[in-house]
Amino acid sequence: MTLVMSPDSSYGRYDAPAPADNRIMSPVHKEREPELHIEFDGTTVLCRVCGDKASGFHYGVHSCEGCKGFFRRSIQQKIQYRPCTKNQQCSILRINRNRCQYCRLKKCIAVGMSRDAVRFGRVPKREKARILAAMQSSTTRAHEQAAAAELDDGPRLLARVVRAHLDTCEFTRDRVAAMRNGARDCPTYSQPTLACPLNPAPELQSEKEFSQRFAHVIRGVIDFAGLIPGFQLLTQDDKFTLLKSGLFDALFVRLICMFDAPLNSIICLNGQLMKRDSIQSGANARFLVDSTFKFAERMNSMNLTDAEIGLFCAIVLITPDRPGLRNVELVERMHSRLKSCLQTVIAQNRSDGPGFLRELMDTLPDLRTLSTLHTEKLVVFRTEHKELLRQQMWVEDEGALWADSGADDSARSPIGSVSSSESSETTGDCGTPLLAATLAGRRRLDSRGSVDEEALGVAHLAHNGLTVTPVRPPPRYRKLDSPTDSGIESGNEKHERIVGPESGCSSPRSSLEEHSDDRRPIAPADDMPVLKRVLQAPPLYDASSLMDEAYKPHKKFRAMRRDTWSEAEARPGRPTPSPQPPHHPHPASPAHPAHSPRPIRAPLSSTHSVLAKSLMEGPRMTPEQLKRTDIIQQYMRRGETGAPTEGCPLRAGGLLTCFRGASPAPQPVIALQVDVAETDAPQPLNLSKKSPSPSPPPPPPRSYMPPMLPA
């Protein structure tokens, strides 16, 4: 019996036994090598470590799940394997990849698996912030070292900046001189434009065209900034801050040579020549135009070379005092190196080097001021331009609608199409003077051109014996979208009246009617529309119905009131008021008239509960009136008890007069009258002494007396 050892095992080390089929071998047969059974169809990717079928791209290489997990555990747990005893050259296969872990980890690293790609789990925020700060500081130090190496070489820095300016700028001295000579020889002046230099006739351009005209120029400034040594070492935020703040300044320095002071004009980007006086001064732009030409004349008088312009543009862009910068130290170093290069070039080309450099650097505040003013003007121009384009689109849409309506009318009326085709033009109110003037000029031109055609048409029709009158479409009304529309005009409808040039085919009568219609005053449609609607509407309710609706109680109280009135009507023995005998009220006592029960209709009191209650209540009286009423009632009771059967004689004092009629009706009525002295000073009643009451006579038969209501 023979033990088969692994081919890569060493002496003295016991390994696991081989499979059963290879464990006992006859002395005749030799030992077989292990076979790999992997189906390979031409698209299968194998593991770079063990040769097994790869499951994906893990930690930088194609590997299987076993090698991926082995490498992750080894790195995360920081396992130190025992060194290999076979010269660290073990063969790592699928069937024996677990035998030597040291060589397996070594092969994983050798084929390209990255230690940094392994995640270590959740990192605390403080630890993560510390790691990021350390990484940023190390990156910043590396950038500073590289920038120092680039900026310390002065001649190389100077050459790179000048070459970048010549490669990215289209307006060098030679090219601008050729453009200026061509513009002077064959001047092509642009139309009057808004106060936006270097851009002719912006009112005829869209915002997209205006942006495309400056796109390549702005792109040149951005490319120039990227070619400055040390600019690529800045962060994205610092790059954006520098370009946003200094882009227009550098662009203005590049285009300063386009201003021609002797001719008092400017060469536009399209090669046209624009006079200074042709620039409109709207929106307080005259100060901007004058300041721009003055600054351009000042800069052009210095006669800067291309190298000086390139270095000056770099200094304008790389400025350390821009708000929002993070790496200010690197920007300051770049600015100082660029300034020293400019000083070197000025010293080589000019005799007065320091004074000229000082004069050139003094222009930076004025340049920033002009840049700010120009940016504000561009914002205003953009707003006005959008409004102008919107108005133009509105006019075009209105024209298309009128054209469609005219075509429909002509299709309906073949006779009217002959005469009204010339009078289908409409007049529109424009919100801007420029647009109004343009449209007015266009109408005048069309009207002048159509006079001859109209005259020929009239002559031809008159020769043939035809009289054609224009067919005018009826006025159109715009009906309000209302769910309760009653068909009543509200007074807000606007008549869409077609106004056009007078047609040559119209008869004298129709022309007179048109003139009379034009002279007729048109009332404003928006003058008190609610009042007009109310006056035009017919009355919906009469007064009684309106009052019933206004004082209509809730539905649950209506049934209660109906029941109450039905019970009151059905109650037996209800007293009916008797006819009142004539009485003689005194003219000086209107506050105490004789009262009688008021018949109130059931439906009215039921529907007007509050009103009926207020009418049935007695009026509120002052204390003096209450006292007087009590005295009157006392005298009334005395009169009833002490009055004779036939009548009551009038007393000398005459305060009360009792009339008793001889009517056979059993219900006598007592009329009271208070005599008021006709003297100037009223005499009060003396109630201190009580007169002895007479002996009571036999009581008369009891009669009904209606209740007295106080006045």
UniProtKB/Swiss-Prot annotation:
Keywords in alphabetical order: DNA-binding, Metal-binding, Nucleus, Receptor, Transcription, Transcription regulation, Zinc, Zinc-finger
GO biological process, one term: cell differentiation
SUPFAM superfamilies the record matches: Glucocorticoid receptor-like (DNA-binding domain), Nuclear receptor ligand-binding domain
Segments forming domain NR LBD: 153-400
Residues in coiled coil: none
Biased composition (Pro residues): 574-590, 693-711
Role this protein plays: Orphan receptor possibly involved in the regulation of genes in the ecdysteroid cascade.
The protein's name in its UniProt record: Ecdysone-inducible protein E75
Originating organism: Galleria mellonella (Greater wax moth)
